[in-house]
Design a protein with these regions (language model features):
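Extracellular and organelle-lumenal recognition/adhesion modules and their flexible linkers in secreted
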Residues: 97-229, 342-346, 353-355, 367-372, ...
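Beta-sandwich interaction modules
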Residues: 193-201, 236-246, 347-349, 385-428
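Predominantly extracellular/luminal cell-surface or secreted proteins
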Residues: 89-91, 175-181, 226, 326, ...
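N-terminal beta-propeller domains
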Residues: 1-98, 261, 265-304, 331-333, ...
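Short beta-strand segments and strand-loop junctions that repeat across beta-rich extracellular domains
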Residues: 107-111, 265-270, 368-381, 410, ...
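Beta-strand-rich solenoidal segments
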Residues: 90-101, 219, 224-298, 395-409, ...
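Beta-sheet repeat architectures centered on beta-propellers
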Residues: 2-98, 239-241, 523-526, 569, ...
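Autoprocessing Asn-cyclization modules and mimics
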Residues: 95-112, 121-141, 154-156, 229-232, ...
């Protein structure tokens, strides 16, 4: 029998046609079979979907992925990633560079370093290296330095300039200032391996300084003034990678994971200065230590050299990998070229002859230098050993006779006058764990290395560890910041950094603050599609969702208090999950259904539930991107592979789960991506951006189009309900420019 049902609320949204006959379900009477471009409110009313305002085009109209950057309410940006390029939008405008005639002399170093002044400190060396690099090799204390004064024409003074610096093997220290060695324009900063676009405004001519104190070769590829136009920073992610980019942000740094790609960092160094650099921890994480007979032999204790394997082991894809080699016995060496230069320490323990070590000094005679032996009981506070001071070459043995005490020793240059004095301490007991990174591949038994932590011997050792990440072993696919640690997951493993040390994975750190490394080890876990820092750290695997937890509620995760448990077997699609308060929302592995992860009040564990139960086909033919808008209400934008959007109006407390559809069919409108920036002070709505592919005048274009605010769509003098609109506000005019996008 027909009925007249009063529509008292429009916040039930779409219901599946499979459920239309369910008259026994109260919400069916208030639901719709079709609800397109209508936006319900939790309150019960609804409105026409606001228009989409034209912001600008993607680079070369290519497909892109937008990443929100939010430092504060007032400091926000949208990062546009296209194939191997990043551009930055601030307040809906791209960062651009001004046209200036200023130029760096010989900024790419094709054959030499002409134009750059050598100001190396004693013992350090800055040289040209094959491949067209500036090579900086410090001593650990003395710096290799190159300077250049750059002339600025009068008309370019007080105009913003930008340096584009490409670092092949970092880090390198940069300073830019009005005088040599000063940093009034760009404060002294460390530049990692990658690309840097650094803005500054000189009042006149300025000096660039590139330097390194590290006792390993640092390679800089180029240093040039950026050309006029949009700022573009090179990235490692090609077009096929964009859907797999997984970011998480801490202050000015966005950490980025991507399937089969090394981790990177996007760094904001100032509002208009950005970098994209490799994430390169120097102390781990490492795989399980070698248990076989294969040995590795470093050719040097420090600096740059080679690593030799006793069997055919290395692959070209090992380049970039870390290796740790633990020696039998300890040997430390230092070429002293400045006062207070010192060797690393050796540890002396045991009794009797086990405590004897050798002191070897060369290049000392006739220099006027003085070298002393120092002792420490904590490897931090040093005192001179009485009677152990040298001004000429010497080789001698020393035994302190402090049986059963743990003592550290080192050699120090207390007086420096000239030359290079080589100081070596050697003891046959104890061990040193050195760490290197592979820089080049020669063959299966030989690779080039840079030493990050000095080795203890140049003899073969079967006590070695391989780094967990490399092109050979694979890279993590997801990242999250949780509990004061930086977490990476993928390749069946989850790794958490040292507490409050996001770039340290040093397993020698003792106690609860040490790093965490665990195998997930259940089901297909090669790719972790997302990590969400909810009340618990959640991982989205291909066949299950995992919860990282301690033994007791609210205890922090530590190396000895860490467990991984399956909490759902729905499995996750290759779409980044999103966090809504303490709840997670993700796409089920089929790619079309949307689930939430909620804390169960009884078990205090996270469980999954379907948000699309009453309209299971809402995600068809597949969801490719998601983002959450919190103001004026919580709305989850789910971009579908057919170019439309499934929009979830959501309020957990009010039990509102309302699905509607959004489309923009004009000019073949096809939504490909979504990004949300939060509202700021005085703003009532978040900023929602769609990337829309359209056909304009027969050409394919891709526009960023921004949702209008609801207040601008209420029928006032300005009503912004059109799509790809451009609004003009000003004096009466017969000609309006800037309409090329139409």
């Amino acid at each position: 029998m027909s009925q007249n049902i009063p529509f008292i609320a429009f916040n039930r949204g779409i219901i599946s046609e499979l459920a239309l006959a369910r008259a026994d379900i109260k919400r069916v009477a208030l639901s719709a079979e079709i609800m397109t471009n209508w936006i319900p409110r939790t309150l019960g009313s609804m409105t026409l979907r606001p228009g989409l305002g034209y912001i600008g085009s993607t680079k070369d109209n290519l497909a892109s992925k937008s990443i929100p950057f939010v430092f504060s309410q007032t400091q926000k940006a949208r990062l546009e990633l296209t194939a191997n390029i990043m551009r930055v939008w601030i307040s809906d405008a791209l960062i651009t560079r001004a046209a200036v005639s200023t130029a760096v002399t010989n900024g790419t170093w094709p054959v030499n370093l002409t134009g750059w002044t050598d100001n190396d400190e004693a013992g350090a060396a800055s040289t040209w290296a094959a491949g067209g690099y500036m090579q900086l090799l410090g001593t650990g204390t003395a710096a290799a330095i190159r300077d250049q004064q750059v002339t600025v024409a009068a008309g370019d003074a007080n105009v913003e300039h930008a340096l584009n610096i490409v670092v092949n093997r970092g880090p390198v220290t940069l300073m830019v200032g009005p005088t040599v060695g000063s940093d009034g324009y760009i404060a002294e900063t460390s530049l990692g391996t990658g690309v840097h676009s650094l803005a500054f405004t000189p009042a006149g001519s300025f000096w660039i300084r590139l330097q390194s104190r590290l006792d390993r070769a640092i390679l800089v590829d180029s240093c040039t003034i950026e050309a006029a136009g949009t700022m573009e920073v090179t990235t490692p992610w090609d077009a096929s990678d964009l859907a797999n980019v997984r970011p998480d942000q801490s202050a000015d740094v966005i950490y980025v994971a991507c399937v089969d790609t090394q981790q990177y960092k996007i760094e904001r160094r100032a509002t208009r200065s950005w970098s994209v650099v490799k994430f390169e921890p120097e102390d781990g994480p490492f795989r399980t230590a070698n248990a076989g007979t294969m040995t590795l032999t470093p050719s040097v204790l420090s600096g740059n050299g080679s690593l030799t394997s006793s069997v055919n082991f290395f692959r070209s894809t090992h380049v970039g990998a870390l290796f740790a080699v633990t020696s039998t016995g300890q040997s430390v060496l230092k070429d002293m070229t400045i006062v207070l230069d010192a060797t690393n320490s050796i540890l002396v323990e045991g009794t009797s002859t086990d405590r004897a070590f050798t002191i070897d000094l060369s290049g000392l005679s006739g220099t006027g230098n003085t070298v002393i032996l120092q002792r420490s009981f904590d490897d931090a506070t040093w005192v001179a050993v009485s009677g152990k001071s040298w001004t000429v070459d010497a080789v001698e043995s020393y035994n302190d006779a402090l049986d059963n005490q743990i003592v550290y020793y080192r050699l120090l240059c207390s007086v420096y006058a000239a030359g290079t004095t080589t100081a070596i301490l050697t003891i046959t007991t104890g061990s040193v764990r050195g760490i290197c990174r592979i820089t080049g591949y020669t063959g299966g038994t030989l690779v080039g290395i840079e030493v990050l932590k000095a080795f203890g011997a140049i003899s073969a050792s079967d006590d070695w560890e391989e780094g967990r990440w490399s092109d050979y072993r694979g890279w993590p696919s997801s990242v999250a910041l949780y509990g004061g640690r930086l977490w990476w997951a993928g390749k069946d493993n989850v790794n958490g950094s040292v507490s409050d040390g996001y770039e340290s994975y040093d397993h020698t750190v003792i106690g609860d603050s040490g790093p965490i490394s665990r195998t997930i080890g259940s089901g297909p876990v090669d790719t972790i599609n997302w990590m969400m820092p909810l009340d618990r750290l959640m991982l989205g695997g291909q066949m299950a969702e995992f919860q990282c937890m301690s033994n007791a509620l609210d205890e922090p995760l530590t190396p000895t208090n860490f467990n991984i448990k399956q909490r759902s077997t729905q499995g996750s699609a290759a779409v980044n999950g999103i966090k809504v308060d303490n709840q997670g929302i993700f796409t089920q592995r089929g790619g079309a259904r949307v689930f939430s992860m909620d804390m169960d009040a009884g078990s205090l564990n996270y469980v999954s539930s379907q948000l699309s139960a009453l309209v299971p086909e809402i995600g068809d033919p597949g969801i490719v991107a998601m983002a959450v808008q919190r103001q004026p209400e919580t709305r989850v934008h789910c971009v579908r592979s057919d170019g439309t959007v499934a929009l979830l109006v959501f309020d957990k407390l009010e039990e509102v789960i309302c699905w509607v559809e959004v489309e923009t069919p004009g000019a073949g409108g096809f939504v490909e991506d979504v990004c949300v920036l939060p509202s700021g002070s005085g703003e009532k709505e978040d900023h929602v951006y769609y990337q829309v592919r359209r056909t304009i005048n027969g050409a394919t274009v891709r526009y960023f189009e921004k949702w209008a605010t609801e207040v601008a769509c209420r029928g006032d003098a300005t009503t912004l309900l059109a799509d790809s609109y451009i609004a003009y506000s000003g004096v009466a005019a017969t000609v309006i420019t800037g309409l090329g996008s139409l």
